[in-house]
Swiss-Prot record:
Disulfide bonds join C81-C158. The lineage of its organism: Eukaryota, Metazoa, Chordata, Craniata, Vertebrata. It comes from Leocottus kesslerii (Kessler's sculpin). Phosphorylated on some or all of the serine and threonine residues present in the C-terminal region. It is a multi-pass membrane protein. This is Rhodopsin.
């Protein structure tokens, strides 16, 4: 065993918590949206996509990790490793690109009156398709020989192999591709869209300083922007930073805990994504009651 039995018990307990909270919250999101017609709007499609992505991670990854943590190593073999790595990566990437699409949609929403643009169901479906295609460009290559999925950290879950330079897998090029396309670009887009959104709301508030409604809207949008950006950074910054450090320092000493902790952060959105992106929509709580 790479760590003490208490470490594996803690890992299993954390996975159980993610399943216990993540499954009902995301399932409830899907159920409530499908049951209430007023929630089935094009702008809410991407929130449904986010819930589906979280369920992928819960059912395809967290349950597996909880089971393998009871044994102290990944007991499901090469096929099991590929499947677990694929579902967790796919779910995580769908969620990531859903946040990008959501940021773009909200940015467009601010300027649609200026540009005479109407956000339709076709645009929403295009956003969903884009998030799935981008997720597939990250999750599929390790199955076909560009990089690979291997047990990582405490060896109870599988992820992309960013810490070895195995011959024949072109790990270096894939890690660089992942860091640029699946971390930096989404980060830039999210910062740009929410930054522009915040500026637009502040300009509107400045033009109507005496309007209490406008000032309240400014505060709500500002809070939403801060929470969304922090949520993205908490999820992906630790994982991307550690992966890049390990990649750039091949041969350095690092323990299993060092590689496992960032994965904890990357999996936590299955709980807080619904709370941030759905509960902040005032229609959802009313429909749940």
């Amino acid at each position: 065993y790479l760590v003490s039995p208490a470490g594996y018990a803690a890992l299993g307990a954390y996975m159980f918590l993610l399943i216990l909270v993540g499954f009902p919250v995301n399932f409830l999101t899907l159920y409530v949206t499908l049951e209430h017609k007023k929630l089935r709007t094009p702008l809410n499609y991407i929130l449904l996509n986010l819930a589906v992505a979280d369920l992928f991670m819960v059912l395809g990854g967290f349950t597996t990790t909880m089971y393998t943590s009871m044994h102290g190593y990944f007991v499901l073999g090469r096929l099991g490793c590929n499947l677990e790595g694929f579902f967790v990566t796919l779910g995580g990437e769908i969620a990531l690109w859903s946040l990008v699409v959501l940021a773009i949609e909200r940015w467009i929403g601010v300027f649609k009156s200026i540009r005479n643009f109407r956000f339709t169901e076709d645009h929403a479906i295009m956003g969903l398709g884009f998030s799935w295609v981008m997720a597939a460009t990250c999750a599929v290559p390790p199955l076909v020989g560009w990089l690979r999925y291997i047990p990582e950290g405490m060896q109870c879950s599988c992820g992309v192999d960013y810490y070895t330079r195995a011959e024949g897998f072109n790990n270096e090029s894939f890690v660089i591709y992942m860091f640029i396309v699946h971390f930096l670009i989404p980060l830039i887009v999210i910062f740009f869209c929410y930054g522009r959104l915040l500026c637009a709301v502040k300009e509107a508030a400045a033009a109507q300083q005496e309007s209490e409604t406008t000032q309240r809207a400014e505060k709500e949008v500002s809070r939403m922007v801060v929470i969304m950006v922090i949520g993205y950074l908490v999820c992906w910054l630790p994982y991307a930073s550690v992966a890049w450090w390990i990649f750039c320092n091949q041969g350095s000493e690092f323990g299993p805990i060092f590689m496992t902790l960032p994965a904890f952060f990357a999996k936590s959105p299955a709980i807080y994504n619904p709370l941030i992106y759905i509960c902040m929509n005032k229609q959802f709580p009313h429909c749940m009651i």
